[in-house]
From Swiss-Prot:
D-glucose binds at D111, G129, G246, A247. This is Lectin. Binds two manganese (or other transition metal) ions and two calcium ions per heterotetramer. The metal ions are essential for the saccharide-binding activity. Keywords: Calcium, Lectin, Manganese, Mannose-binding, Metal-binding, Signal. GO terms for molecular function: D-mannose binding; metal ion binding. Residues 211-217, 270-275 form a propeptide.
């Protein structure tokens, strides 16, 4: 009897050891994935949260109309697990979207448009040149926000001294950490791809005008910057768009949007898919 009990105890110890090893393996090696693709925005787009003047109509997301002093934002409704506190892992992600900035005059356009990553409880911030995402040109770690801006209006207090319209990468401040001069093609559809490589912390932005009629002008732009996401944004974030107008204005529209992230070494696995 004692021998049988010893064998049973040994069996359960081995079983427990295998079980714990398996649980640990899956905890370390599981991948949490979030994906969605919106090719046409519906009037009652259920997976978006609208803030300010943002709304959907005629298959597109309108952030602002071409009127003065507006702020419009739209957020993906499900929070994104961008890094894992237990393992220290950071997500790789790629997002692509098409947008149009359309102003009555190509010489008087404001203020711009952003894709941003922010805390789950994010609210519209200061309008005008702050693009509805920031409140200061000074670095503010409590902002916990990273944005890619498509800036159409020069603000002397923080914009590049060349006064050109530009693409910028913003980290906890409206003053960009890196910029690329950009020739806005008024009313033309722009394709954007933003990718983050967690191994290198490099954020890459590419904008192209696929149907450009302005052959003499640059129609493709690329910008890179090291952004330590884990040190800037919370573990769980929201992603979205923001646009503003001021004394000058433009309509800011998004025509399609897709997103895919993979966070390795997490304790759970999730797949979100929306059309």
């Amino acid at each position: 009897m004692a021998s049988l009990q010893t064998q049973m105890i040994s069996f359960y110890l081995i079983f427990l050891s295998i079980l714990l090893t398996t649980i640990f393996f899956f905890k370390v090696n599981s991948t949490e994935t979030t994906s969605f693709s919106i090719t046409k925005f519906s009037p009652d787009q259920q997976n978006l949260i609208f803030q300010g003047d943002g709304y959907t109509t005629k298959g597109k997301l309108t952030l602002t109309k071409a009127v003065k002093s507006t702020v419009g934002r739209a957020l993906y409704s499900t929070p994104i697990h961008i890094w894992d506190r237990d393992t220290g892992s950071v997500a790789n992600f790629v997002t692509s979207f098409t947008f149009v900035i359309d102003a009555p005059s190509s010489y008087n356009v404001a203020d711009g448009f952003t894709f941003f990553i922010a805390p789950v409880d994010t609210k519209p911030q200061t309008g005008g040149g702050y693009l509805g995402v920031f409140n200061s040109k000074e670095y503010d770690k409590t902002s916990q926000t990273v944005a890619v801006e498509f800036d159409t209006f020069y603000n002397a207090a923080w914009d590049p001294s060349n006064k050109e319209r530009h693409i910028g990468i913003d980290v906890n401040s409206i003053k960009s950490v890196n910029t690329k001069s950009w020739n806005l093609q008024n009313g033309e559809r722009a394709n954007v791809v933003i990718a983050f490589n967690a191994a290198t912390n490099v954020l890459t932005v590419t904008l192209t005008y696929p149907n450009s009629l302005e052959e003499e002008n640059v129609t493709s732009y690329t910008l890179n910057e090291v952004v330590p996401l884990k040190d800037v944004v919370p573990e769980w974030v929201r992603i979205g768009f923001s646009a503003t107008t001021g004394a000058e204005f433009a309509a800011h529209e998004v025509h399609s949007w897709s997103f895919h992230s993979e966070l390795g070494g997490t304790s759970s696995s999730k797949q979100a898919a929306d059309a």
